[in-house]
Structure formats: structure tokens, C-alpha cells
């Protein structure tokens, strides 16, 4: 069995979506402080983290798209353990729209069918090219509404991409989120290492969210498993 990590590392002030709270990570109690508190028996250090529910590699809950949408603590866990494929879209220029014909060509090139009730991961190469420079937050290509509709028509539960947003920055990205609400589909953002999945066929995707009450999304530890 081979497990490939598709998740960004979390650390203090790691890049976050523009306008959202920063990721803050620090020491709450050192080993030395805890050792003294224990009566010089054992010192157990503790860290703390503060972050938005859309920080790092994460999945959007339907609640993110609309106030009546399902919160992340109610999101079906069976949707987080599914078959998946990865499409090579690295030829798409920065800031460009991915259209249905791009997806159709990528599926044909991959030579593998899209799994029903599974996931489709879109490797644009954006993370590999730009992280952690400022361009990571602004220059990504992404799906447009028509491509989002095409993905939903494939009877998948979600799709994922190696950038901070599913669509290109601006109006198109907002319309893609609106389409996700209307189409009852969601997506994962800020994946990485998708290049390792290219031309390898179907895999098992695992990406379990935290059980945050009324959460609009959640960080996930996303992995692809071959030979499970």
C-alpha cells in the first residue's frame, strides 16, 4: 500500500485566503514550565493554534455557500472516503478559466473513467509553481461555471484543486461557489502534491474534516491511497 500526502503543512502565518484570519501557531506551555508545575515529575509541552475553518488544505461545507446549507459537522463521512482520479491541467495558463472541453480532454488523456460518487482532483500545477509567494493567492487558474456543471453531471460528490479557490480570482470564483450550492456539490481547496497522482489511474481518496459545530468548512488531512 502506498499513501501520498496531498495536504499543505500548517505553521505560524502560513498563507491564508485574502481577507480571512491568519493562522496563528505558538507555544502555550513549554516543557520546562510544565515540569515545574508537575512538581518536577514530568513536563508535557502544549502548543495552540488559531485559524479560520478554511485555512490550509480544507473542504468547503455547503453552509459556506448559503446559510441553510449543511454545516461541516453534519457532512456525510462516506463522502470523505471515496474513489478518485486526478486530471492533468498543468497546461492551463495562470488566471485562466478551465472549461468543459479541458476536462473532457484531460479525462481522455488520463485513460480512466470518473468514479461515480467519487472525486476528481484537478492538478493545475499552481501550488508547485507559486507557493508560498504572493502569486499563490492571486494567480490560479480554475473552473468556470460550465466546468463546475460538467463535473456535477459526472455524479461525483466533490472535486479538489491545488489552489486557494476553485475558480479564477474574481467574479467567476463567486459564481462557481454559487453554482456549487445550486448543484449540491462541494470542493476541496489548497491541495498539493497532485503531480504525484498524474497518469497513475484510480486511487482511494481520504479527507476527513474536523467535527466543528456549524462549521462552514474544515481543514482535512487529504491523502491518496494506492493498493488499499
Where are these regions (language model features)?
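Active-/binding-site microenvironments in catalytic and ligand-binding cores
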Residues: 1-228
Amino acid at each position: 500500500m502506498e499513501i501520498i500526502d496531498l495536504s499543505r503543512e500548517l505553521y505560524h502565518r502560513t498563507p491564508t485566503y485574502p481577507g480571512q484570519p491568519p493562522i496563528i501557531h505558538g507555544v502555550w506551555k513549554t516543557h520546562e514550565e510544565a515540569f515545574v508545575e508537575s512538581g518536577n515529575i514530568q513536563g508535557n509541552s502544549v502548543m495552540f493554534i488559531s485559524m479560520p475553518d478554511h485555512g490550509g488544505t480544507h473542504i468547503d461545507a455547503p453552509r459556506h455557500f448559503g446559510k441553510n446549507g449543511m454545516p461541516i459537522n453534519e457532512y456525510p463521512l462516506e463522502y470523505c472516503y471515496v474513489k478518485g482520479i486526478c486530471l492533468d491541467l498543468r497546461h492551463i495558463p495562470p488566471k485562466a478559466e478551465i472549461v468543459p472541453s479541458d476536462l473532457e480532454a484531460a479525462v481522455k488523456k488520463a485513460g480512466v473513467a470518473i468514479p461515480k460518487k467519487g472525486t476528481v482532483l484537478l492538478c493545475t500545477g499552481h501550488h508547485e509553481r507559486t507557493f508560498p509567494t504572493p502569486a499563490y493567492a492571486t494567480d490560479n487558474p480554475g473552473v468556470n461555471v460550465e466546468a463546475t456543471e460538467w463535473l456535477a453531471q459526472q455524479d461525483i460528490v466533490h472535486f479538489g484543486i491545488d489552489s486557494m479557490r476553485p475558480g479564477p480570482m474574481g467574479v467567476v470564483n463567486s459564481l462557481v461557489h454559487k453554482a456549487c450550492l445550486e448543484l449540491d456539490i462541494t470542493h476541496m481547496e489548497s491541495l498539493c502534491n497532485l503531480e504525484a497522482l498524474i497518469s497513475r489511474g484510480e486511487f482511494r481518496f481520504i479527507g476527513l474534516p474536523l467535527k466543528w459545530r456549524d462549521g462552514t468548512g474544515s481543514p482535512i488531512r487529504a491523502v491518496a491511497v494506492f493498493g488499499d
